[in-house]
Amino acid sequence: MRLEIRKKWDLPLEQRIALAVLSAAFLLGGVTGCLLASLSSGAGGSELGDYLTGYLELAREGTLPKGLWPLLWGQAKYLLAVLALGLTALGLAGIPILFGLRGFFFSFSAACFCRVFGRRGLLPAFFLFGLTALLWVPALFLAGVPGILSARKMLRRTPGDGVISLSGAWWCRAAMCAGLALTAGLLEYWVVPVLLRAAARVILSS
């Protein structure tokens, strides 16, 4: 029984390679973001501290200027880029680069809170970035792995191969990823401000 379950969830070799490449790109971007955040010191570090303190003060007062559509677009734009790149040969290089950038901005933003507030910064960093990442990270990888494999096939095509038609599986996967990304945007709009407000009160009062 265990062997059957294991075989069912085992990925083909090409998918495992694609997953490893994208994971490495995302991790490399994340490590770079953390290192860059840790290097902020002197006047730059002071300005960063003032900025994040002011940001938490706005969060505590519930006056952060955030609209629904910009948040939804912020969550969807990376996914749309991955889906689009997967339809061209450029995706073979473009998708890993995009994963690296996404990992960099994610970790840099979170690490800045820890750089300024120490351990206390973990709480607002998780509420602001980590909570939605539980949704958009799976969506990104779910679109990225088949996307990079599709881009590889596009690279091998010849001019006389004809037009590629998108399969029903592609549309189902795209809809699932879009649902996760949009849910992350709604979570960031309705839930995150409440949790961030509570975290800001704890940090600024201590």
Language-model regions, residue ranges each:
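Cytosolic juxtamembrane amphipathic/interface segments immediately preceding
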Residues: 2-17, 158-166
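N-terminal signal-anchor transmembrane alpha helix
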Residues: 9-45
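Alpha-helical transmembrane segments of multipass membrane proteins
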Residues: 25-33, 135-136, 180, 184, ...
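Perimembrane loop-to-helix junctions flanking transmembrane segments
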Residues: 45-66, 204
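Interfacial helix-start motif at the membrane-water boundary
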Residues: 57-84
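Conserved mixed alpha/beta catalytic, RNA-binding, or beta-rich assembly cores of soluble enzyme
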Residues: 95-118
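Alpha-helical transmembrane segments of helical membrane proteins, especially in multi-pass transport
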Residues: 128-151
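Terminal transmembrane helical module of multi-pass membrane proteins
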Residues: 143-206
